[in-house]
Amino acid sequence: MDRHITAPITKETAKTLHAGDYVYIAGTIYTARDAAHKRMQETLQRGEALPLEMKENVIYYMGPSPAREGRPIGSAGPTTASRMDKYAPELLDLGLGAMIGKGKRSQEVKDAIVRNGSVYFAAVGGAGALLSKCILSSEVIAYDDLGTEAIRKLQVKDFPVIVVIDSEGNNLYETAILDYKRES
């Protein structure tokens, strides 16, 4: 089923999404990769405020290439999500609405998604140039010293993703394998 949603993503919206749904996101999302996640964890350990509010926001695991003239961003393909698994449960517990990446997630992340009524989306790896066409603007908002891994605020329109883990814990990567085996 194709869905069009607007970020930030509320728990109510997350509940309507199901593993396997094709979703087009409009609105504001943020980027963060390994180094930014590590720095956010260190910030929380010091008892300081994060550079962005987690509640209902979307983090896209992506570090863009340089923008061509006239474009807000360069190639913007997803990063392997499992690299953020040690940080994700804490951010989900702070209210993170959704994550976008590629690949499988740990059981701890899946449990945190269910516990918090969140969702994990996958974007197509290798399609970064095409995905960048859905990004209307890009602004570094934190950790500028991290270069491509700085946290960016993106405005997106019709950004294509697939629900991999929904708020009930259904996991497309697991169900698709079972469906394939039944068909074989």
Predicted segments — roles?
Residues L17-H18, I73:
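Short, polar loop/linker segments at the starts of domains and inter-domain junctions
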Residues T31-A32, A36-F159:
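Feature captures the catalytic cores and cofactor-binding loops of soluble hydro-lyases/lyases
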Residues M1-I9:
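Short, structured beta-strand/loop micro-motifs enriched in basic residues and often containing a Trp
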Residues A88, V164-S184:
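Active-site/ligand-binding-proximal alpha/beta "capping" segment
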Residues K11-T16:
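Short, surface-exposed secondary-structure edge patches
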